[in-house]
């Protein structure tokens, strides 16, 4: 089965879906109308959507006509939330919601997965297994995948496929390389407690600001001295707050930041070193301190060679040997990693950077959009991967 021609037949319908959802973006955990509209379309295809009480997002199951004993279930995922961005694309179908925009291409993901589902439903009688459809909310705040998992979205699933349209990757290439693809992202909060004093008498207090500055400085050595230089690691301080008046030494400083790495081992080690730095630097200065670490997303890593091969062969089947291209791993993060922590998964990219056609904005930019001719390519990949996976794994 080759879904290229099927995708071309459905191209206009897929584009219509993209334009509809682009005009009606909703923020993370508020995708109420988006969820409802996706559900309507799934029902029109003959599916029974499963919704979550008090939360957004939905799932549905395609039961294959040739499913038998030992049948596999493969999941296909698309994220559905938008960003708090005022759109400046100039599109005729631009956002109707002030200050909210599909600036990361999730409108494209919705339409591509709907297109993939439509094509699979047209051939359900020949499908050698089941397909779980996941329209995931709250990716931008790294909450949606975790919620869906906790409420059974992966129950009975043997593997999962996801992909992202990407402004930093040349159109119309695809990428399904093995190994780490996107970094883990963790948030930290450091509190330094000293002793307040008058600015004229620093010896009478314990300067929380000076202590905090030393912690920031020492933390940079985690990257330069404790980490293998061939392993990307970023330790970033995003906020530092302390003091209320120019002539008073404050007794407290609070700092927050993020740690990003492509190594699960270094992820754990960084927390240990940062905790040690806080403990020892505050002790040297006569202060006290604490570190709170909030684990957000794991490393997105394509570690299952069978899935990598199925995805790459599917791409070549659809668009020929030249459709795949190298893409450097990146330090951005994705909560698709939560799904990969639970079941074998593959995560790919579809390039949208095309300066000749004027598509140069990156994801999260207020001018980000993509050539709609790419949508059928993403839709075909959803359907082709599911079909080929079930064909290969059929017992």
Language model regions located:
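Active-site beta-loop-alpha junctions enriched in small/polar residues
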Residues: 26, 79-81, 138, 166, ...
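Divalent metal-coordination and catalytic microenvironments
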Residues: 21, 60, 76, 106, ...
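Histidine/acidic-residue-rich, glycine-tolerant segments that coordinate divalent metal ions
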Residues: 59, 83-85, 89-101, 108, ...
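Non-cysteine beta-strand/loop elements that form the S-adenosyl-L-methionine
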Residues: 75-77, 84, 188-190, 347-352
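Acidic/His- and Gly-rich active-site-bordering loop/insert found
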Residues: 1-102, 114, 118-127
